């Protein structure tokens, strides 16, 4: 493929993506609606603080300026919230699950309490970058992963 054809194809692709993305964004109107953020932890903790900070501003930037509420659903390391988001929330775009990312591995590892298909969740983003650490005592004899 010549350089000119490749450039033309890329340009056409960009134009189509912009057109279709813009059209889809214009279709959504949340006027009179309420968006619910289901938090997998108790009020007052870090996940709750992130959700409330997002809720305070989120509706201002969506068409129709919907109300945004936070619904804390603690328990089982946020598995209760994940199960609820997947099984009981209507798939209408008005519910956002805010639970610990590792909870989706429960289903992949065969946890019978994980009542969802983790591959069917749509990832929106994360309010913060979190670093995890694994530590053991020297007495275990484990030196690395």
Protein language model annotation of sequence segments:
Residues 1-11:
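Bacterial N-terminal signal peptides that target proteins for export
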Residues 10-19:
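Bacterial N-terminal signal peptides
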Residues 25-120, 125, 138-140:
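N-terminal (or domain-start) structured segment
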Residues 125-145:
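Hydrophobic/proline-rich hinge and linker segments of small-molecule sensing/allosteric domains
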């Amino acid at each position: 493929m010549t350089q000119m054809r490749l450039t033309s194809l890329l340009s056409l692709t960009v134009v189509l993506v912009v057109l279709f993305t813009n059209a889809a964004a214009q279709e959504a109107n949340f006027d009179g609606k309420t968006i619910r953020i289901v938090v997998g932890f108790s009020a007052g903790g870090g996940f709750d603080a992130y959700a409330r900070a997002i809720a305070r501003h989120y509706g201002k930037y969506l068409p129709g300026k919907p109300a945004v509420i936070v619904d804390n659903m603690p328990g089982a390391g946020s598995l209760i919230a994940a199960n609820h988001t997947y099984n009981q929330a209507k798939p209408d775009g008005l519910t956002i699950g805010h639970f610990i990312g590792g909870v989706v591995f429960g289903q992949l590892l065969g946890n019978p309490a994980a009542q969802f298909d983790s591959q069917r969740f749509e990832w929106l983003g994360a309010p913060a970058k979190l670093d995890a650490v694994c530590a053991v005592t020297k007495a275990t004899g484990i030196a690395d992963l």
